[in-house]
């Protein structure tokens, strides 16, 4: 196959992928877009459409929009669920590094987390499996062997000339508390001390040391952020509006230390947080605000922000980005990595230098490497010694939507994708979701004309009545991105024809945002001013912070977070602080309330559990 | 300490009267008969189940065999895509008109789009949960809603292998990461079992212990036993202080710890006897089109070895993930896979690329099956004691249909399946029924699996 044929074949493949949407995604209405941001300002909405089950047996056919029951927004302050959370690979490596003072990166061999909403830290989907459990054994063995050579301070009495069994047993008590991020219970300490003594007498000091460390590293209290129900020592008056003390309680101080440190740093609490927890005053708004300010100034907060965006924006997909050598002879292996670095530098810039969401949406800054510069028509900056900032013309670039890296990611090897780009905007930036497809359409797509512009090819969608309904929610939005090719380069023509960047946004959660626009810069400026997108980004951060999406219990917290974010001109530090100060972050349901609600929501599971118990199961 | 490649024979288990020396094979794998058991019926070997999946359907004209003039099931010519499997034809079993009823798009069962349904439904026999994953069409679905048969079987018939299952992937997490379109195996509803994409990780997981000196390994196992005992005891401490929902999570965790504990205590899992030391795989970029063929080979070598060493009896092998847009440049396929699969029938260039991909997948299957067939076990081979199933998560790309899913089986599961045949069903049947056949082959007396409304009893004519 010659190169030209390759290119054409690739192009056909790409175009046809888009057509799959046409096959699948009809039956749309504007109102069928679901919007996942829920806050207290929303009045309960009845199902947007009445279920049309048309006599079908299965109530879950895609013809049936399977509308959620009407949303009932509870009144007043509340807090949502607080399930235990398994450390992610990132958190595991950070935690073991902080605990031992050396880095082994054992988690690089763990299987990947199960994603939810793009996030790795979802409490319900990131869970253990046998492979992971087996990997924990290997990891704990590697770490404990290294720790024997280079013990953490708490365990220094276990190793070396001055070591003794008595010193080590004392050290185990301290170490257990640090590793567990809370004071260890006596019964726990006794277990580890017993293991140490038994192993020491049978196999000597080293084996005793290593096995004890392994047992601690494999304990659920280490592997999970497990919030136990201890009465909080704090007797704070609930804030104005009144938290129902019968139903909610403040998160305990050590647990709050972990909530803070894993949210803002992705690692275990440092000494200062643990000291504040010990004093017992960590969960006051004043102390929390101080701690957030301190923590945000730390480099670990930057790294956490990188992690958030890696997941939210799907940046791991850069690993799979390839471009067609025929269409783009200047493309080189390794450029996808540079584009990833470029996006990360942009995020770092808008978060920590510009500091506000507005810049995220509108900044014309693009960060280049020597490899990338010629690709985007810039001279190499010899003095930069790495990535450097170039401000592109404001009519070409505005914020994340026009970043070359994002455009290249949301594209095929040989051409851009209006579909990928539009769905990405809907899902990730507007928190909107397209409705399920119809069940009864089968269309064999025609062979597209390889000389057509992307826009011309996609016109098929809207020319076909069945396709048009849904694609009106997608294509006109995506067409606005036609000014960027598959590498994210600005372009005026495609296949010798002038580029048309006119687009239209319909069905967005905010009426004022809807309407025609010309090019992404126009769109980006409109989105930057919108409430819907600021709400969506605060929801994404909330989801990341809590390890779960918001539910109706969080409605009041969501409103307050968003209001604070807006009041402080969408400054990111304000957003982090507002999340930490929210009721959802500071409070949790009392155990009996949580249990009653869980049982009500999961009757089948409860019946199963009860049956197992009656059978004398484990 | 790593044992020499041609090291001493170390029988791992009491062999009764069945210990017999086996010749070294040129493949570098030596069969392990340590798991053979003498029963009233004579010497029996463990049965294995290996499941292989590739995304985006097939070209049916090239996949399905042509029936011969006699009309007999055994009278058929392999399809063009399966040419690499020709030497193993007598050990193949191809099926026609078996539908993925839990996903069947025509009837649109449950949440999700066809790719999602196919991945989450094929081994679980269930529709998907509701959830947050965005499919190719913007619709949403959650994870699979039940246990897959590999885990079902591992819990029941293979309690003493070092690992219950092995899941390997060749770029299984590429682009979309870990979501319903990249997972086929489930320990339970909403509990997908992730594949390992890096052969080095597979090697470390499966063979670190096996490469340790058996004497030293006994000590390590004893220590691990003590550690896990302590871990288990500490559970009690947190359990009594945990909230209700967390207790359920802790119970699941503890159950797995106990399972792992008993597997680790099993005498075995060390190199010796008929299980050879694998070479350490090279460190390769795992998410790259440049390394895919090599990674596939490394994985297949490790899978063969894991089975030969009886490290596990249940394997899933995944080529990328469903609806992926990967290129296969090494077979001159430069289009993106999912896009190509949508091409209309008149698009010959796309069809040619897809045929080349199907054939490459067949080569991978042939490579593995040939290896398994070179490992003697009793009168037959390891392949004879295996049931291998290869399919895709949809039947055909441009319709996304789940009708007539392409299914190729190999190995007879110890003589249970009658191979060397192409079996076609007049009335359409369900993949759930095939799951029942497989369970029956492992001695599981079940009549349905997964959601019973999609079951009609085991497929006829296979045994």
Region locations from a protein language model:
Chain A
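N-terminal secretory signal peptides that target proteins for export/translocation
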Residues: 1-11, 44
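C-terminal motif of bacterial Sec signal peptides marking the signal peptidase cleavage site
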Residues: 23-27
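Ser/Thr-rich, Pro/Gly/Ala-heavy low-complexity intrinsically disordered linkers and tails
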Residues: 28-75, 240, 610-617
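Short, functional "switch" segments adjacent to catalytic/cofactor/reactive centers
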Residues: 67, 113, 122-173, 226, ...
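Long, ordered, helix-rich scaffold segments
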Residues: 146-148, 152, 205, 223-227, ...
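A conserved hydrophobic secondary-structure block that centers on an alpha-helix together
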Residues: 163-212, 220-223
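Sequence context surrounding c-type heme c attachment/ligation sites in exported
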Residues: 179, 373, 389-528, 532-534, ...
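A cross-family structural signal marking well-folded subdomains
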Residues: 286-424, 435, 614-617
């Amino acid at each position: 196959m010659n190169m030209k044929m390759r290119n054409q074949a690739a192009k056909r493949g790409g175009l046809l992928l888009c057509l799959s949407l046409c096959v699948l995604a009809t039956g749309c209405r504007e109102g069928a877009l679901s919007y996942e941001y829920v806050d207290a300002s929303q009045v309960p909405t009845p199902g947007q459409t009445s279920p049309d089950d048309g006599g079908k047996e299965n109530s879950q056919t895609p013809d049936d929009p399977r509308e959620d029951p009407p949303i009932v927004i509870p009144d007043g302050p509340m807090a949502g669920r607080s399930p235990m959370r398994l450390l992610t690979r990132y958190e595991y490596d950070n935690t073991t590094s902080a605990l031992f003072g050396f880095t082994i990166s054992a988690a690089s061999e763990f299987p990947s987390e199960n994603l939810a909403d793009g996030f790795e830290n979802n409490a319900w989907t990131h869970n253990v499996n046998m492979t992971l459990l087996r990997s924990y054994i290997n990891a704990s063995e590697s770490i404990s062997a290294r720790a024997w050579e280079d013990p953490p301070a708490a365990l220094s009495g276990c190793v070396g000339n001055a070591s003794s069994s008595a010193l080590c047993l004392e050290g185990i008590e301290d170490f257990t508390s640090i590793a567990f991020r809370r004071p260890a219970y006596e019964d726990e300490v006794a277990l580890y001390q017993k293991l140490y003594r038994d192993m020491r007498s049978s196999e000597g000091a080293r084996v005793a040391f290593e096995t004890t460390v392994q047992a601690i590293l494999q304990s659920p209290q280490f592997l999970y952020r497990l919030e136990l129900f201890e009465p909080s020592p704090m007797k704070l008056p609930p804030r104005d509006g009144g938290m129902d003390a019968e139903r909610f309680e403040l998160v305990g101080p050590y647990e709050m230390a972990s909530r803070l440190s894993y949210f803002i740093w992705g690692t275990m609490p440092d000494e200062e947080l643990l000291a504040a927890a010990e004093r017992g005053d960590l969960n006051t708004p004043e102390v929390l605000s101080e701690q957030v300010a301190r923590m945000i100034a730390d480099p670990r907060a930057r790294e956490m922000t990188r992690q958030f965006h890696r997941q939210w924006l799907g940046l791991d997909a850069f690993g799979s980005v390839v471009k067609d050598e025929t269409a783009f002879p200047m493309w080189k292996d390794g450029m996808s990595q540079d584009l990833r670095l470029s996006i990360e530098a942009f995020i770092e810039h808008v978060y920590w230098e510009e500091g506000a969401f507005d810049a995220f949406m509108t900044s014309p800054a693009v960060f280049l490497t020597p490899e990338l510069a010629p690709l985007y028509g810039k001279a190499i900056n010899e003095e930069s010694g790495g990535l450097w900032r170039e401000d592109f013309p404001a009519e070409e670039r505005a914020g994340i939507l026009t970043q070359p890296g994002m455009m290249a990611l949301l594209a095929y090897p040989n051409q851009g994708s209006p579909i990928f780009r539009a769905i990405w905007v809907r899902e990730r930036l507007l928190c909107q979701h397209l409705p399920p497809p119809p069940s009864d359409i089968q269309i064999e797509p025609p062979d597209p004309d390889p000389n057509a512009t992307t826009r011309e090819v996609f016109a098929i969608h809207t020319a076909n009545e069945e396709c048009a309904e849904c694609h009106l929610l997608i294509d006109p939005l995506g067409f606005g991105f036609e000014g960027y090719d598959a590498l994210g380069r600005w372009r005026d023509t495609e296949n010798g024809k002038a580029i048309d960047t006119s687009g239209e946004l319909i069905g967005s959660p905010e009426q004022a945002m809807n309407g025609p626009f010309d090019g992404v810069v126009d769109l980006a400026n409109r989105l930057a001013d919108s409430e819907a997108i600021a709400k969506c980004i605060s929801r994404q951060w909330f989801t990341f912070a809590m390890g779960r999406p918001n539910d109706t219990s969080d409605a009041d917290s969501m409103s307050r977070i968003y209001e604070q974010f807006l009041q402080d001109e969408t400054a990111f530090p304000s957003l982090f602080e507002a999340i930490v100060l929210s009721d959802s972050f500071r409070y949790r349901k009392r155990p009996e309330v949580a249990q009653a609600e869980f049982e009500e929501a999961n009757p089948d599971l409860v019946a199963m559990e009860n049956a197992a118990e009656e059978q004398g199961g484990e | 300490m790593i044992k020499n490649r041609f090291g001493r024979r170390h029988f791992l288990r009491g062999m009764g009267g069945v210990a017999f020396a086996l010749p070294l094979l040129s493949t570098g794998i030596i069969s392990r008969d340590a798991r053979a058991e003498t029963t009233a019926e004579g010497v029996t070997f463990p049965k294995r189940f290996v499941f292989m999946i590739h995304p985006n359907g097939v070209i049916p004209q090239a996949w399905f065999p042509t029936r011969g003039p006699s009309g007999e099931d055994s009278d058929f010519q392999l399809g063009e895509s399966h040419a690499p499997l020709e030497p193993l034809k007598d050990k193949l079993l191809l099926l026609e008109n078996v539908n993925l009823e839990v996903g069947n798009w025509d009837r649109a069962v449950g949440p999700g789009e066809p790719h999602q349904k196919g991945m989450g439904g094929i081994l679980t026999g269930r529709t998907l949960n509701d959830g947050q994953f965005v499919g190719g069409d913007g619709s949403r679905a959650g994870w699979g809603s039940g246990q897959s048969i590999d885990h079902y079987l591992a819990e029941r018939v293979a309690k003493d292998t070092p690992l219950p299952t092995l899941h390997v992937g060749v770029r299984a997490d590429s682009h979309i990461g870990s979501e319903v379109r990249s997972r086929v195996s489930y320990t339970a509803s909403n509990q997908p079992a992730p594949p390992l994409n890096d052969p080095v990780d597979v090697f470390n997981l499966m063979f670190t212990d096996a490469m340790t000196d058996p004497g030293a390994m006994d000590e390590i196992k004893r220590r691990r036993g003590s550690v896990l005992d302590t871990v288990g005891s500490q559970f009690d401490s947190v359990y009594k202080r945990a909230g209700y929902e967390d207790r359920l999570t802790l119970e699941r965790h503890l159950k797995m710890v106990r399972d792992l504990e008993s597997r680790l205590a099993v005498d075995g899992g060390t190199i010796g006897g008929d299980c050879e030391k694998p070479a350490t795989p090279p460190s390769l970029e795992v998410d790259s089109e440049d390394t895919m063929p090599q990674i596939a080979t490394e994985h297949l070598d490790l899978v063969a070895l894991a089975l030969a060493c009886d490290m596990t009896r249940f394997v899933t092998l995944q080529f990328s993930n469903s609806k992926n847009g990967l290129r296969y440049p090494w077979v001159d396929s430069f289009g993106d896979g999912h896009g190509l699969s949508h091409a209309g029938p008149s698009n010959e260039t796309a069809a040619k690329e897809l045929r080349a991909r199907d054939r490459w997948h067949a080569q991978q299957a042939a490579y593995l099956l040939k290896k398994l067939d070179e490992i003697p076990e009793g009168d037959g081979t390891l392949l004879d004691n295996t049931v291998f199933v290869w399919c895709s998560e949809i039947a055909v790309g441009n319709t996304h249909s789940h009708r007539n899913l392409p299914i190729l089986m190999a190995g007879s599961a110890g003589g249970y399946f009658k191979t060397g045949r192409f079996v076609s069903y007049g009335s359409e049947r369900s993949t759930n029924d095939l799951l029942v056949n497989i369970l029956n082959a492992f001695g599981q007396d079940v009549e349905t699996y997964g959601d019973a409304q999609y079951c009609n009893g085991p497929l006829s004519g296979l045994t």
